[in-house]
Amino acid sequence: MLPLPSEQRWQLPAPVQINPELRGSGLCDPLLAVLQRRGYSDGAAIEALLNPAPAPDPRRHFPDLGKAVQRLRQACKQGERLAICGDYDADGMTSTALLVGVLRHLGAQPQAEIPSRLDDGYGLNSGMVERLADDGIRLLVTVDNGVAAREALLRAHELEMDVVVTDHHTLPEELPPLLALLHPACTPDHSPYRGLAGVGLAYVLAMALARNCRSEQGLAMARDLFCIGTIADMAPLQGVNRRWLIDGLPALKRSGLAGLQALQQVAGLDDAPVDAGAVGFQIAPRINAVGRLGDPQLVVDLLTTANDDEALELARQCEQLNRQRRDLCDAIEAEARALVEADGEQRCPFLLLAQSHWHHGVIGIVAARLVDAFGLPVALLASEGDGRLRASVRAPKGFAVDAALQACSDLLERHGGHPAAGGFTVRAEQITALHERLNERADTWLKQQGGLRLVEPEALVQLHELTPQFWQQLQQLEPFGSGHPAPLFWSSRCRISQQRLLRGGHLQLTLRQGDAAMRAIAWRWGSEENLPPEVDVAFQLRLNRWNGTEQLQLELAALRASSGDGLLLERCNRHYWVSRDGDTLVIRNAAGEELRGQPDRTGVCTLSSDHPSGTHPYVQALLQDAAMAMGLAA
């Protein structure tokens, strides 16, 4: 949901002089401005982004990789039974399926072991270890978990089991004895492997093993699973992640995995490309829905079967669970919104809401929706029984969830997370004290923000510039995701010629700017309030496919009333009135003195008349700031 104009604080980027060296990339000025502001300051940096270096030999980056490969090769040669112990999210399930598929191809007998989100909780546990040992399993490989399972690892050591841990979660200070550990933190500083998720580590292990066995036929399908899991887990799209995604995403459409073909079919992707967006918004949710509501073994079976009919039946089960997940999310969101809105103007700065019947598997999704709706940190709690509640926490940019939970650790039984999201378990009698402490922290943060949500566009683009050629150049910067988001553009003085509230509370606009017109969509707007006739919009550019047609449209992140006749600009504690006369910039100071200039795309102004201070650095910087604020510079 977009923040209302009254709830926003726009922070426009500083004007930038495009480095002439960057123009050799063939990209247009708005995209070059985005890249230069992100730190890509020369041609070599942009080339490294567009065409990353091949992955270096992983054996030089993971100290224990050789030991892990040697033990797994022995298992493959002997047809040994072993367990792949995964996690119930998309990263963990794709990691499990990846290793199961490769190890079967190489002669081992792997079995998937993934705990239930509802019955078992996260990760490897002692009961699982003992059950596997009783069943004759002597080799365990964890994927996307393991480093936090101290008791389980100690029990495996006592039972003389060989354990290979592959995990990307925070390493504890000390680990029990292991055969091998593959973890990004074990790689050298600045290693391109540092950003790997669980599925990336599984892929590294699978590649090294297959090459050691001189049998690489199954690696193409392993790469497909790497792409799905990496995007689903929102791993940073840097280093080898970016290199392998650039190589692998174009092949997903024709994947040899029957399960992936079936998922494309049930997701309605038959005639659409399978890019990072399709993975993140169409395929990954159908996989994650199983981990949230069902048995993760369903996904492992789907992604390892070679039977097309079986794959389609399993994919349909994923689709059914995904629909159930959507219905649950909508119902819980409606209840949560009602609770928040019942407080009216007395709304707490930290939204902590609890209902015993809410489903643990989906409250994190709903918490994220509420963050978008209200711009506040949110914790949703559901009952675990025995007087305990388990929570999912989400927060806006700038509010550190992990630090907030650590500050409340004395009130919590368990907690964990990172700056944007986390979770905790708390006893019911501690909730009031917990909420008070979280409110204090959120109130301090809100005051620092001025109570407004920050909107930070990266480059100015006029509507007439949003052509198919612009879209093609934007696609050269893909894939987008964590660490490399799709650019947030802005455009000024757009006239709203049509406004329609769609089913689901989405707002559709037709925007006009001169002779150019574009359709825009604001997801989950949820309001029929009248908008200003002329607006500035912050947006990401999307390609909308519908009924066999393709059309560029703006996906709105924010809008505000255009400055109209002008705006007040502050610089160095001095105030100036800034306005436009066509494409001419007009600046007046408190004494009524006036500057007029014609800014170029970067904000550099040619003054309309000779002015004694026209070349002074302060005046030039003032002109650039004013040109940016009025939408005359990128």
PLM features: what roles do these ranges have?
Residues 138, 179, 536:
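Conserved acidic residues
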Residues 2-5, 13-138, 211-431, 450, ...:
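Hydrophobic helix-and-loop "lid/oligomerization" segment in the mid-to-C-terminal part
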Residues 151-155, 366, 469:
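A short acidic, amphipathic alpha-helical/loop segment
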Residues 168-169, 359, 418, 506:
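Histidine-centered active-site/metal-ligand motif
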Residues 1-12, 157-174, 249, 253:
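An acidic intrinsically disordered interaction segment
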Residues 37, 242-337, 372, 393-415, ...:
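Acidic, two-metal ion nucleic-acid-processing modules in DNA metabolism proteins
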